[in-house]
């Protein structure tokens, strides 16, 4: 079944076209050109700011001229991840999709429905001549996934609307009215490599097949973190014997839980069988700890060629640090209405080894900005104690709930009318561009919703097809009644 046979056809037609366009974060040039040409070819006012954000404005249909101007917003970039054995270039290749029951999947790569499906919905509305709506601004931001570059660089006045619907949420039936703020903390450990002491034996260990997932949405699902597993093993062995680290590589993205990783290390040859035995016990324990959330994990341990290693003190400090930097949920929201939601978390996201340095990235989130600062400082302190050079991103603010939101009221009433049940109105422990918009446009009335996505930021990303129709119907009804 092709995308064009799925319903609503006009949305899936646009999504198929979008997935032909390479659009990695920070490399959205072709998508920007496509949007500019789309707007101009439809005779619509089209504007691009200096950051690369694109807005396409469409006049109101007859009878809706006095409605408030509604902004529909999505981001044009996508997370690029693939299975290890898949040959795919995200800078040149089109995403290949297939249907499995009620789900749309990609062949060994991320699907790009985060947030390509939001873009497709906007383009389908712009392309239509039979949908009732007031004045519209369709906004497409760039580089949301890595740095929120588009939203951060957007100047006041680029968007002129009164209300905004962000189409970057992943659970149909849920209307989001607040989000977490976040920061990224990066550490650079430097050293001068040296030859391993005489009589050392080199081993390589790896873990793969973890579920991974989004470091905001999935951080409370008790999934394993490949970095923390490998660091934990290194720490245990380091406490028992002379151990020198040579390489540690895991994770690629600050906003994804690392799914696989590998280490290379050296131990005295007399200890190699001890390490093998310890590895078997250790991995059995890990499998037991995560037997529900990680049913398929693959562990490997083998010998490898001799390499240069970190000096003893540098190796020890790094391993101690990676054991000490905690990962996961630290606090749940205290407000009774939001008690289900994570408040503060940290994701140890990536470790990459170069010749004479190791770089680590961790991502902190919180719906309380003072707690975000505290968690960031806690991570920073652990890195600094281990002798690393530390940098922190500017981050992005939390989006606070507006109890007087007219748009929320309209969206809830519309959903109840269409589907005969109440939507879930909630906050989210993930960053949405709405947080940054709320700083630049303090009076902007906002909600966020979208079709159901699962396992975003991983090659298992999939889109629940029936929910696209539901979101489409819901959005059109809201536009009709504003």
Protein language model features and the residues they cover:
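His/Asp/Glu-rich mid-to-C-terminal helical/loop segments that flank catalytic regions of hydrolases
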Residues: 222-240, 269-272, 316-326, 332, ...
